[in-house]
Amino acid sequence: MPILAFTVSSCEMNLVPDGSIPEKEALRTVKDCDAWVLGIYSAFKNDALYSGSMALLQDIQADMAYAALKTNSGIYTQFYQWNIKSTTSEIANVYNGLYMIVSRCNFFFDYKDQVEATLKTTADKDDFKKRVGEVYFARALAFSELIRIFCEPMTTANANTENMGICLAMTYSDDVPMVKRSTLLESYNQVLSDLKQAEENIPAARTVADNPYFSLGAVYALQARVYLNMGMGDLSIKKDNEYLKKSVEAAGKVIKTGAYTLSDAVNNAFQVGSTQYTDYQMMWKYDQSDEIIWKIAMTPVSYGGTLGRYLLGYNTVAYSPQYHFSEAILSLYDDNDRRASVFCNQLEDAYGDQVYIITKYPGNPDLDGGATPKFINMPKPFRLSEVYLNRAEAYYWLGDDENAQKDLSSLKRKRITGFGSVSASGDDLLKEIKNERARELYMEGFRLSDLKRWHDPVKREKQLYSIDGSINNELNVKYTDAKYRFTTWPI
């Protein structure tokens, strides 16, 4: 498919190089649409996004990982030490990567009518309708991530403040730097509008587990996430909060589809060769599980970033990790919590020290061919566990401790051997919700934005074999500190 950059102006786009496809000719048939939408899916493989920077750097900037004393070579140091600005290459790459997806979606919308006018058969019309829904979802997801990472949390006070939202580029010819920033409410409303269109166009038959394609389950999961972020910003319990009620409703739709089940981390269910695996282990090693709502499909010859490369630093001889697992986070796991051994192992590094290695992304053997492992795993941007966590938190802010406890208990029973039920209430319940998000969503890119929306400090506690200092393993950035502004990445 032709690659069309979003940064060019409308005048520049009129200059067509010899031998290239004129812009208006790129989308003429259903087959053209199929190819274009596959290109949008492919854009999500970008190693600046879910398979790289966007997933790892928010957690590294927070408190999930510690720079290794002897094996860190300066990788991601700007983020770890909070020395970032809008021109920091990784930030620019995330921003541009998300807007590239928006741009590809907008190009489709600009020219979809000329395709629709040619449709004759029911099959072609159904296929086109499905593609329209997929593109609306892709744009909604990209916009939502831009809001989460590059904007302040929405509150009653700032919802309609000018220039606090994102640039809502709505046509391909829009030059993003020239588009005025919207309000936060306008930004979120555009996401919800796109999700409504996605819901109306994506077929129900797409709602299956372990899916590399967008589905109604993914639509509802994103709605639940977005409504939670819209509704909890005031950090006050309000039983009549409509955003939070809609978050609960959307999460319930995901669960009620019956298509997805929480992965079992307790009982062995699979055997590969001579090795027994739980469903949870299979999800993180082989990228397969009925808990997965949407994963980014990869092959040995078509993949994005390598999530485990710098975390493991393994060269078939020794481990030289750039970062170690945070001992403070590790202490949050119960002794019977089976996630801990999936995400972390104490191993000997290249210097003979016993260090906590981050093993969440060990590399899928079906993707990691060759003598030297690449540590490729398929990102899983939507899982059922996050849906339960979002609903539990929405229930908490609605003042419904009982249902929040039920959702947390449902998740924890699948993760912890012999777990009974959550009994915490009030502030203790909120603390447990926060801790459970840290345990379950470790190194998936949620931590910094979670701390930001809760106004919680970003605090690291000194640990062995990590680089010392107030900007390293003793970092403590409070909500009232000027430095806290960097929990929102600068544009």
Outline where the language-model segments fall:
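Inward-facing hydrophobic residues that define packing positions of alpha-helical scaffold repeats
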Residues: V37, V102-C105, S144, Y188, ...
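Membrane-proximal, proline-rich intrinsically disordered regions
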Residues: C11-Q61, A251, M298, G305-Y319, ...
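Structural register within alpha-helical repeat arrays
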Residues: V132, R139, L146, Q223, ...
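Short, surface-exposed recognition loops and adjoining beta-strand edges that mediate ligand/DNA contacts
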Residues: S51-A68, T122, C151-E162, I166, ...
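Extended ligand-binding clefts on enzyme/binding-domain cores
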Residues: V176, S182-E186, N241-G252, K256-T372, ...
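Conserved, well-structured interaction surfaces
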Residues: G74-F150, S182-L185, Q197-T207, T372-P379, ...
